[in-house]
Amino acid sequence: MTLIDGKAISEQVKQEIAAEVAEIVAHGGKRPHLAAILVGHDGGSETYVAAKVKACEVCGFKSSLIRYESDVTEDELLAKVRELNEDDDVDGFIVQLPLPKHISEQKVIETIDYRKDVDGFHPINVGRMSIGLPCYVSATPNGILELLKRYRIETSGKKCVVLGRSNIVGKPMAALMMQKAYPGDATVTVCHSRSKDLVKECREADIIIAALGQPNFVKAEMVKEGAVVIDVGTTRVPDASKKSGFKLTGDVKFDEVSPKCSFITPVPGGVGPMTIVSLMKNTLLAGKKAIYQ
């Protein structure tokens, strides 16, 4: 069993990005600038945004954090999004999700200029991705592709089961795993809460990508010998022994599943760090105007 070390790979990729940024700046180019909008004080969102700001420092990017209280109006937030769309100094920006109930996440996503949508959530980026055109691919699926590549995991002709059908992970992941490229060319099945025989589907899978948000959902009897298991789940489960009062728990029951796997990602330290690195890669592309002029 090989443990896929997302933390180590993410550090490596950040160093590669930093070297490229240093080169750009040395030749008189502009330092890439990522802005983030954070609404309210959700614990998970605070943690993610802090990690993104820190990653920007390591990569040599400029970063801006714009904060609002959770009672900010939708109009106020959309006005800020439009302002960032027009700001030539900002290469890419994200609005950290989830947003408070009174704000339409979809409206916010669609208001972002797709050329600055480094999260890859805008319908134009999603559509381009689904037909294999250059675009900003959403960060978590892109991070998973990077891990498959760096560990040279064979995907062509393999049966891949994606657990979950969210717009952020499940759907794009399925589209990417069946694209005509490496990593891809897999035979993809998407399972979700309404799927029948989910256990049977998983048992036949060469690759399982679990993105349900249900702690310890994937058990040993659902995984065949030699499977590759990618765990996208990060649920905060209360744990009195931890200083924070919780433990990050994946969708896979790691201790019992890992002995059967050829490759598996841990939680934390697997997919999570790669998500942030993918955002950095998209920001670099935005700064270089590599995809959109």
Swiss-Prot record:
InterPro entries documented for this protein: Aminoacid_DH-like_N_sf, NAD(P)-bd_dom_sf, THF_DH/CycHdrlase, THF_DH/CycHdrlase_cat_dom, THF_DH/CycHdrlase_CS, THF_DH/CycHdrlase_NAD-bd_dom
Keyword entries, A-Z: Amino-acid biosynthesis, Histidine biosynthesis, Hydrolase, Methionine biosynthesis, Multifunctional enzyme, NADP, One-carbon metabolism, Oxidoreductase, Purine biosynthesis
Protein name: Bifunctional protein FolD
CDD domains found in the cross-reference section: NAD_bind_m-THF_DH_Cyclohyd
Organism of provenance: Bacteroides fragilis (strain ATCC 25285 / DSM 2151 / CCUG 4856 / JCM 11019 / LMG 10263 / NCTC 9343 / Onslow / VPI 2553 / EN-2)
Protein family (similarity comment): Belongs to the tetrahydrofolate dehydrogenase/cyclohydrolase family.
GO molecular function, one term: methenyltetrahydrofolate cyclohydrolase activity
Record's GO cellular component terms: cytosol
One Pfam family in the UniProt entry: THF_DHG_CYH_C
